Amino acid sequence: MAGSWRARGSLVVLAILLFGCLFAISIAKEEATKLGTVIGIDLGTTYSCVGVYKNGHVEIIANDQGNRITPSWVGFTDGERLIGEAAKNQAAVNPERTIFDVKRLIGRKFEDKEVQKDMKLVPYKIVNKDGKPYIQVKIKDGETKVFSPEEISAMILIKMKETAEAFLGKKIKDAVVTVPAYFNDAQRQATKDAGIIAGLNVARIINEPTAAAIAYGLDKKGGEKNILVFDLGGGTFDVSILTIDNGVFEVLSTNGDTHLGGEDFDMRIMEYFIKLIKKKHGKDISKDNRAIGKLRREAERAKRALSSQHQVRVEIESLFDGVDFSEPLTRARFEELNNDFVQKDHGTREEAMEDAGLAKNQIDEIVLVGGSTRIPKVQQLLKDYFDGKEPNKGVNPDEAVAYGAAVQGSILSGEGGEETKDILLLDVAPLTLGIETVGGVMTKLIPRNTVIPTKKSQVFTTYQDQQTTVSIQVFEGERSLTKDCRNLGKFDLTGVPPAPRGTPQIEVTFEVDANGILNVKAEDKGTGKSEKITITNDKGRLSQEEIDRMVQEAEEFAEEDKKVKERIDARNTLETYVYNMKNQVNDKDKLADKLESDEKDKIESAVKDALEWLDDNQSAEKEDYDEKLKEVEAVCNPIITAVYQRSGGAPGGGSGEEDEDSESHDEL
C-alpha cells in the first residue's frame, strides 16, 4: 500500500478553532479473496455495455440480440416487462409505460430544476415521493406502481448481469459500475443502491473518463503522457485530465455537467420540428405522446446520420391526424440548433485544463468517449482549441468505459494476472466537501480534485455559551456560502458538556472512500462522545428497509420474467412441432407417400385442432401448452413410429449400416 501524508495546523480566533491533518492513500491492490469474476458495467443514460476480462484480454459481451450495447430502456405491457431493444422498439406505441433517461433522475431531489425540466419532456409520469422523483407506471392488469430511479436502473443492471452470465456460463455476483466523474455523493450512493437491488455486490464505483483512460492506456508503455478524456454521452458530460506513466493513471482534474448529452441534441431537433409543424399545419403535437415518441426516434436517427452526411430527410408516416411528415435537416441547421451546448462543452474543457495547471501543448493525446463525440462540430472545436491536433481514434467511444471497468474488475478479483498487476488508479473527488459554520459560511475540508481515498479532520468549537448540542451540516460545492452549495445532510452531536463559547473541542472528520462516497464523523474531544454518518436519508437516499423491499420485488419480477419466457418457449415448442407435422404430411419427400389415408387424416385432424386451439388460447399458461403438445404427440408419434418400422427403420425406405446416421438425424 503506497501512501502520502501531509499535515498542517492553524488556529482561527473567530467561530472556529482549526486544526487539520490530511492524507491521501493510493491503493495498488485490493483484497481479492472474496470476489469471484468481477464484470465491468457502463450504466449509461441511453445505452449500457458490459465487459469481462478473460483469457488475457477484455471481452465486450453482446446481448441476446447480438448487439454490444443495450438501450437503457424499460417497458411494461399487460403481459410482461421488457428491457433493452424490446422496450425501445415498442416505445412509440406504448409511450406512457416505457421508461428511459432514468440516469438523469437518479440521486436527485424532486424539486431539482433538472428534474422539473425533464418531467415536461418525457411521456411517462414522474411523481414526488418523500422529496424524490419516482416513476409512476401501469405494469399489468391495470395495476399502477411507483418505481424509484434506483429500481429502474437495477432492471437495466440485471439485464447486463444476465448478458454476462449467458456468455460466461456461470452466475455473477460482483461488478464494477461506472458513473460520470461529476456525479455527486447522492448520485454515487444511489447507483450503488441500484446494484444492490439488482443482486450485485458493487465492488467499486469508478469514474467513466478514468475507465476510458484505462482502455486507452492499458497497453501503452514508455514515458509519462498527459491525456484529456472528452466524454460526451447520451445524458452526461465529463472532461478529465490524467497523467499515464507505465500503468499509473493519475487524475489531475475533472469537470463536467451531469445533465448534458446527446438527448439534449435530440430534443433541440424535436423542438425545431414541433415549431415547424405548428407553423405549417396549425397543430401543436407537444402533448401527443405517440407523435412525440415517433419524432424522438427519428430525431436520434437524423442526428446520427448527420455525423457522416450533410443533409438528411426526416420522414414519419402518419405522424398526427393521418398527416405524413417529411422535412429536410442540414448539418448546418443541426449545429446552429445546438451551438450553445457545444460551446458549453468546450468551456468545461477549459476549466479542467486550468485546474490541471497544464498548457494546451502539454496534452499528448485527446481521447473521445461517448457516442455524441462523433458529432463533427464537437471534434472540430476540440481540434481548433488544440491547434489542429487530431483526437485519438483508437478507442471505441461506445465500449471504452465498459472496457476499463472490466480491467478494474480483473484487478479487484485477481483474474487479470500479469497484464494488470501493475495498474494503479489515482482518482479524485470531483466537488469540494465541507460544513456550514457561523454566518452560513462554507468551510472546506476536502477541496475538489483531491486524490481519493482521502481523510481530513478539523477541530471546531461552540458559538454560544452553555451550548450542549452541535449541528453538523454537510455541503458540497465550490461557492463560499452554503446557500449556494448542495446540502448533503445533517446530524447532531448531543451531550456536549455546558461551557463558555469557544471552550469545547469538536473534531469533525471527513473520509472519502475509493468510490467517491463520503463518511462524516464528529467527536467531542473532551468526553470522547461521537456520532457518524454515511450521508443517508437527508439527501434522499433509500433506507435499508426500502432497499430490502426493492431487492425482494426485483426477485419477484425476475421470477415473473422467467415464467413469461417459459410460457413463450412452451408455445414455440408446440407451434414448431405442429407446423413441422403439417409440412411432413404434405411433403412427398418426407411422409406424404408413406402414410395410409386414415393415418394422414388422424395427423391432419390433430394438427388442425392444435392450430385452432393456439389461435383461441394466445395467453395460455406453460402447463396448458405442454399438455396440448402431449395430446398432439399421442396422436402423431405412434403413426410416425409405425411408418419408420414399415420402411425398414429409417425414413425414405431401405436399411443397412449406411442409413444409421440418417436415422439419428431425422428423429422427430
UniProtKB/Swiss-Prot annotation:
The keyword Cytoplasm does not apply. The keyword Glycoprotein applies. Expressed in pollen and nuts (at protein level). It is found in: Endoplasmic reticulum lumen. GO terms for cellular component: endoplasmic reticulum lumen. GO terms for molecular function: ATP binding; ATP hydrolysis activity; ATP-dependent protein folding chaperone. Residues 644-668 are annotated as: Disordered. It comes from the Eukaryota. Residues 656-668 have a biased composition (Acidic residues). Gene3D superfamilies: 1.20.1270.10, 3.30.420.40, Actin, Chain A, domain 4, Substrate Binding Domain Of DNAk, Chain A, domain 1. Keywords: Allergen, ATP-binding, Chaperone, Endoplasmic reticulum, Glycoprotein, Hydrolase, Nucleotide-binding, Signal. Pfam families: HSP70. Its EC number is 3.6.4.10. It is an enzyme of class 3 (hydrolase). A motif (Prevents secretion from ER) lies at residues 665-668. Residues 1-28 form the signal peptide. GO terms for biological process: pollen development; pollen germination; pollen tube growth; protein folding in endoplasmic reticulum. Probably plays a role in facilitating the assembly of multimeric protein complexes inside the ER. This is Endoplasmic reticulum chaperone BiP. The lineage of its organism: Eukaryota, Viridiplantae, Streptophyta, Embryophyta, Tracheophyta.
